[in-house]
């Protein structure tokens, strides 16, 4: 006969003396469970009264100690329903274990649903009957600290004979039995006045039980709701549990555990899991869930200031409200960069560090001295730092911190103790830390910042453009010119006295010039490794101790490194090593990359060529370490050999993938932890003690809006109509992104018309997509129609007849009847067909005014009809009399000037505005120097020719990517020469070439001929003149065509300044963001 034994747990047996072990085949009369009946069945057999009594007890409360069982049997076995009385005593008034001289009793566990597998129970786990003992760790409790509190709805497990006092102090006890398995959860019971009153829900049991078992936390409970009548079985009541972390919670060695872990199989196969691994899994599960339930959030990794904020607010559950995923932007990144100069490490460094006078001729500014201290500390030259810092010595604490400096482990997050309470229980422990750290991957906790130490001696100097990164770097080189402790072994000869500096070609001679300017030691030599100056046997010239002319600095270009790498790559040996030739034949003392963002793409040959250069110390100088992607930083860390971030799989795991998964805060925390010890950035707007780091003259930027002339306006409107039609069609069809390239073509045309109509049809020079010039029949017809509608001379014969007849009517003392200027300079004079002379700007303004009034265009003097296409200008070149006689059939003398037909389309409205500014500058401030910026090299060509025609007082230089190295150097030297003849020197500079490393402080005026999408690109160009060394107020004029696409581009620039310039993870995402900007361009 079989009977069903109903019970809510399967008892786990404790190891007992052989005479006390219950017969596993014995049975008992069925008892009703308090909760869920078990489906297990056992056969009924005849047993002794003692066995039946024990079975009845075990069926309700689980296995208990043999001594306790013996005590209960002796007391209640002769009574009717004795087992029930025994259970009541166990549940309401447990026996005193000290009196019974018993260490522990076995505990019962409820059967966990088979779909829930959370953690492994430790076997043979014993629980002291004393409720004050929550764990069995042999380590004494030294301190505990409140981490938070929980409100939990508990369930009464037995009828109570009295109400619970409020507040009702209670105890939690974690009880488990010998046979508890993954499928058999233990119960965490609630005790009040030493009697059990209930248990907590199973989901909470799964979280709290490992905290008990692994000695991670201790708990204090209080009953919050008063029961008006006694509790009945199954009643609910609310308890508050205060959770305390203890000193054992922060144990550093988690590879071993005192509590053995049962590795029996469950729904998951943990058969290959060690005890240590199981303990870590339990700990991770419990810690992460506890922090989640307590709403404890990690801090942002900005700093250790008092006003730190949580990554997500504790007031709002992130699961309740949907928030848009924030975009990471360059403005946020700049905030991260800037925070590095506020590090405690930086604050503890001397601010008086000065390079040796016998080596370095210049005086450093205060912030440069501070930066030099940081660079020496990064190179671990602490003795040199103290020697050069005069009386400002390092404290022992600062020295220790510098020696142990490392990057924060990305697996860890920083937390703030949620309550301002000190640790309790042991007054000798001064636990007043504000922060602690947690590793949610394994549940490890730490009071000390977990760092990954690196052997890197170097870093990234990312000071804003114009703060003197070059001088700061040369100060470092002159402070430590060579390695005082050369490495004993290296697979390449060690050039222990030479620093290799890799620069863009345009900066090669500038670096050499800066070195010579600051060098104060005749034995210190700088050598160029470029072109014909390349040394073939570097191993001898740099490593031979007999060579007295070993350079302390050798400067080369990225192109030179790439060329050598490409040539040698074809000759790699069986191990994949490059031949030891040229730059790859030695290991340098130090390598410095100027404009280091040139290697930001790790897949380019330039980056790969630089990776294989060897040195003991490495530095990167860049004002823009991130250009488009966060992965730009990876290439920098790879060059620096910043372990472990130079391993791409590591980088991808903690930076690339989380960013792609929109885990913005997590990614930024990791990026900050990477940059923190190796990165320094200062800005010109940054202040110290209320004063800017560097005192620069004022900078004034003004926008001058210019109106289109007739032809420009017609042409612009025609292109605009076509562009808007294409955009509207893309919106209507929902394929705007697919029409991206076509729309960019239209935008390009509109921008070209704003600059100069001659740019129409040329290949685009600046955008990401290279757009071939379309041969548009409609466009050619339109241009032809414009010319047909212009009032022009009938033919070339008519032009010459009119022009040559004017020679005898032009007087030297000509007066402009509009502005009354006398005489009118030839370079500004214009002659009408009716032989009246005016200033060019005056007559053009007059004609434009007549157009606005919709009146006929007439000569101001004689009222004859005139047109800007029938005006003649004067060159300062002689004209022979026989040339004139040939056309007018009359005698004529020689003249000192030459007339030519003015072409208003040759000089666009913008160029005319530029000429007006330059002429005004010449008259007000002769000997001035000016920079003119544009993105289009072909536009600069047009400007150059127009300026040469406009005035002989203009000296024009043009600097773009088409110049070779020698021509660039000569051009800049000529431009920087002082002017003494009253003329104006004008440097035409492409925006791309002007954004790299040039020092143009001899100029104080700049003109931006066309806007760019990114305001930061324009700012970098302007910083070429507004930087250290500038002594005059800088004025910048930005020419913008009125009511054009350029005014919309200004809106986009302003938008980027407000919300940041987006750094997208993928190319497609960047294109989508550009579409948003395109929509702004086409807004009416």
UniProtKB/Swiss-Prot annotation:
Gene: RAD5
ZnF RING-type: positions: 816-863
Region (Disordered): 11-51
GO cellular component, one term: nucleus
Role of this protein: Probable helicase, member of the UBC2/RAD6 epistasis group. Functions with DNA repair protein RAD18 in error-free postreplication DNA repair. Involved in the maintenance of wild-type rates of instability of simple repetitive sequences such as poly(GT) repeats. Seems to be involved in maintaining a balance which acts in favor of error-prone non-homologous joining during DNA double-strand breaks repairs.
Top class in the EC scheme: hydrolase
Protein name: DNA repair protein RAD5
Leader peptide range in chain numbering: none
Main location: cytoplasm
GO terms (BP aspect): DNA repair
The EC number(s) this enzyme carries: 3.6.4.-
């Amino acid at each position: 006969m079989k009977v069903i034994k109903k019970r809510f747990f399967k008892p786990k047996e404790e190891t007992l003396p052989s005479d006390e072990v219950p017969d596993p085949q014995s049975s008992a009369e069925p008892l009703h469970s308090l909760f869920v009946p078990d489906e297990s069945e056992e056969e009924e057999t005849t047993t002794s009264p003692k066995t039946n009594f024990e079975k009845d007890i075990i069926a309700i409360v689980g296995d208990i100690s043999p001594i306790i069982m013996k005590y209960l049997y002796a007391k209640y076995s002769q009574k009717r329903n004795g087992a029930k009385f025994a259970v009541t005593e166990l549940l309401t008034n447990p026996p005193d274990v000290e009196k019974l001289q018993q260490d522990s009793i076995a505990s019962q566990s409820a059967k966990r649903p088979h779909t829930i597998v959370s953690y492994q129970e430790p076997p043979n786990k014993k629980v002291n009957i004393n409720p004050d003992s929550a764990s069995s760790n042999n380590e004494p409790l030294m301190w505990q600290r409140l981490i938070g509190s929980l409100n939990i709805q508990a369930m009464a497990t037995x009828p109570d004979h009295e109400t619970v006092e409020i507040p009702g102090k209670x105890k939690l006890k974690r009880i488990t039995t010998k046979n508890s398995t993954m499928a058999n959860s233990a119960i965490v019971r609630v005790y009040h006045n030493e009697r059990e009153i209930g248990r907590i829900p199973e989901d909470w049991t799964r979280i709290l039980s490992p905290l008990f078992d692994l000695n991670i936390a201790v708990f204090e409970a209080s009953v919050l709701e008063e029961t008006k009548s006694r509790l009945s079985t199954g009643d609910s009541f609310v308890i508050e549990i205060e959770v305390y972390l203890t000193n054992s919670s922060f144990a550093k060695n988690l590879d071993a555990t005192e509590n053995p872990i049962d590795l029996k199989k469950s729904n998951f196969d943990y058969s290959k899991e060690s005890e240590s691994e199981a303990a870590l899994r339990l700990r991770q599960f419990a810690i992460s869930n506890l922090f989640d339930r307590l709403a404890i959030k990690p801090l942002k990794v900005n700093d250790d200031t008092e006003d730190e904020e949580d990554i997500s607010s504790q007031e709002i559950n992130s699961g309740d409200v949907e928030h848009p995923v924030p975009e990471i932007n360059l403005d946020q990144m700049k905030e991260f960069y800037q925070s590095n100069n506020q590090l405690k490490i930086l604050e503890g460094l001397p601010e008086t560090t000065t390079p040796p006078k016998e080596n370095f001729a210049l005086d450093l500014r205060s912030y440069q001295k501070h930066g030099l201290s940081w660079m020496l500390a990064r190179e671990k030259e602490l003795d040199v730092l103290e020697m050069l810092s005069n009386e400002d010595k390092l404290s022992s604490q600062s020295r220790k911190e510098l020696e142990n400096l490392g990057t924060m482990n990305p697996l860890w997050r920083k937390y703030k103790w949620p309550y301002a309470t000190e640790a309790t229980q042991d007054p000798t422990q001064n636990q007043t830390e504000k922060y602690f750290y947690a590793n949610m991957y394994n549940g490890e906790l730490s009071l000390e910042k977990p760092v990954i130490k690196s052997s890197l001696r170097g870093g990234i100097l990312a000071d804003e453009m114009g703060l003197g990164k070059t001088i700061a770097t040369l100060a470092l080189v002159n402070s430590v010119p060579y390695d005082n402790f050369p490495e004993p072994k290296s697979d390449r000869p060690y050039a222990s006295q030479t620093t290799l500096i890799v620069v863009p070609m345009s900066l090669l001679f500038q670096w050499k010039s800066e070195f010579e300017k600051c060098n104060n030691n005749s034995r210190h030599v700088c050598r160029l490794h470029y072109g014909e100056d390349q040394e073939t046997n570097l191993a001898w010239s740099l490593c031979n101790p007999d060579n007295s002319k070993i350079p302390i600095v050798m400067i080369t270009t990225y192109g030179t490194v790439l060329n050598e790498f490409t040539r040698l790559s074809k000759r790699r040996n069986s191990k994949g090593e490059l031949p030891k030739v040229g730059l790859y034949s030695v290991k340098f003392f130090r390598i410095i990359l100027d404009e280091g963002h040139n290697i930001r793409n790790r897949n380019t040959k330039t980056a790969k060529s630089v990776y294989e250069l060897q040195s003991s110390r490495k530095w990167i100088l860049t004002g823009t370490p991130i250009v488009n992607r966060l992965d730009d930083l990876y290439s920098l860390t790879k060059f620096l050999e910043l372990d472990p971030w130079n391993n791409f799989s590591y980088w991808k795991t903690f930076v690339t993938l989380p960013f792609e998964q929109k885990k913005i805060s997590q990614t930024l925390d990791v990026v900050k932890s990477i940059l923190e010890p190796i990165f320094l950035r200062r800005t010109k707007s940054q202040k110290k003690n209320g004063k800017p780091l560097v005192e620069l003259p004022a900078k004034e930027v003004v926008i001058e809006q210019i109106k289109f002339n007739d032809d420009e306006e017609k042409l612009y409107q025609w292109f605009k109509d076509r562009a808007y039609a294409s955009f509207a069609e893309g919106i209507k069809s929902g394929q705007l992104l697919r029409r991206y390239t076509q729309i960019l073509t239209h935008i390009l045309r509109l921008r070209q018309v704003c600059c100069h109509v001659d740019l129409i049809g040329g290949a685009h020079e600046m955008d990401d997509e290279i757009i071939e010039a379309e041969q548009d029949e409609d466009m050619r017809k339109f241009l032809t129609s414009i010319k047909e509608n212009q009032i022009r001379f009938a033919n070339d014969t008519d032009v010459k007849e009119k022009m040559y007849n004017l020679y005898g009517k032009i007087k030297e003392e000509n007066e402009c009847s509009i502005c009354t200027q006398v005489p009118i300079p030839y370079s500004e004079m214009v002659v009408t067909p009716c032989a009246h002379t005016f200033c060019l700007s005056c007559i053009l303004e007059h004609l434009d005014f007549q157009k606005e009034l919709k009146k006929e265009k007439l000569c101001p003097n004689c009222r004859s009809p005139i047109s800007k296409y029938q005006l003649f200008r004067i060159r300062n070149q002689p004209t022979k009399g026989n040339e004139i006689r040939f056309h007018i059939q009359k005698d004529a003398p020689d003249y000192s000037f030459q007339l030519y037909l003015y072409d208003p389309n040759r000089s666009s409205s913008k160029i005319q505005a530029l000429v007006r500014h330059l002429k005004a500058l010449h008259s007000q401030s002769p000997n001035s120097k000016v920079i003119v910026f544009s993105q289009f090299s072909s536009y600069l060509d047009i400007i150059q020719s127009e300026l040469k025609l406009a005035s002989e007082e203009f000296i024009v230089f043009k600097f773009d990517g088409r110049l070779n190295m020698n021509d660039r150097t000569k051009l800049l030297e000529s431009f920087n020469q002082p002017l003494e003849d009253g003329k104006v020197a004008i440097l035409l500079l492409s925006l791309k070439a002007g954004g790299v490393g040039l020092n143009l402080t001899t100029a104080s005026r700049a003109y931006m001929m066309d806007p760019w999408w990114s305001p930061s690109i324009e700012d970098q160009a302007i910083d070429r003149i507004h930087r250290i060394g500038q002594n005059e107020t800088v004025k910048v004029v930005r020419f913008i065509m009125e009511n054009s696409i350029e005014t919309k581009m200004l809106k986009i620039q302003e938008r980027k300044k407000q919300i940041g310039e987006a750094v997208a993870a993928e190319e497609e995402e960047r294109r989508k963001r550009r579409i948003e900007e395109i929509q702004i361009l086409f807004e009416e």
